[in-house]
Amino acid sequence: MSLSTAALGIAAPPPSVPLETPAATSTGCLESGDGYLRANLGGAIDATIDWPNSGTRCQGEPKDEPPGVRLSFQRLGGGAPDLLFVFGITGVREGRPARATGVNLTVIVQGTNRIYGTLGDSRCTVDSLAQRPLKARGSYRVEARGFCTQPAHAVRGNDAVLVSTFEFAGLVTYDAQDSDAAPMTSR
């Protein structure tokens, strides 16, 4: 599954010094070592997610409809449950911070047919989002926190998952031609 997310953008970014190279490594989310995903899930999946940089794969790219970004997070080597999170954040623009913007959230239980989605960006919100440029052109460390007020419903069946809170730091590459990261796929 290729990545794409909804956009957030608001004010112009503050001047900043580029960080380390953005390309995710095979052993972690960000080369700088400060990527992560934290989330609280209830319902059909009851879990507290606390994935540090090491062992977490993340990637992100811009999306067109609606404009924004898409970021995904996955633990290398799986886990119980083996989850893939995809955040489509509306209104995000390259290098700009964002506040109070909609999120389309998909949670996939890898190796099964269990897929949960909010089917739009009205059920989850990013409170705040910040971007810092990395050395590779068009690449940014994106840090965000937010919440969902309604659950993501099962694509098949009647189950639902509420991701009550989430926060993450991951990679978005706006210039996909320069990215050497392989697309993340569902198993």
List PLM regions with ranges.
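An ectodomain-focused feature that recognizes extracytoplasmic/extracellular
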Residues: 12-120
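Bacterial N-terminal signal peptides
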Residues: 1-7
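Small side chains
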Residues: 9, 35-39, 144-146, 170
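Acidic, glycine-rich flexible loop segments
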Residues: 96-172
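Generic "edge-of-domain/loop-turn" microfeature
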Residues: 46, 78, 131, 151-153, ...
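Short, low-complexity, Pro/Ser/Thr/Gly-rich segments in the mature regions of secreted, periplasmic
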Residues: 169-187
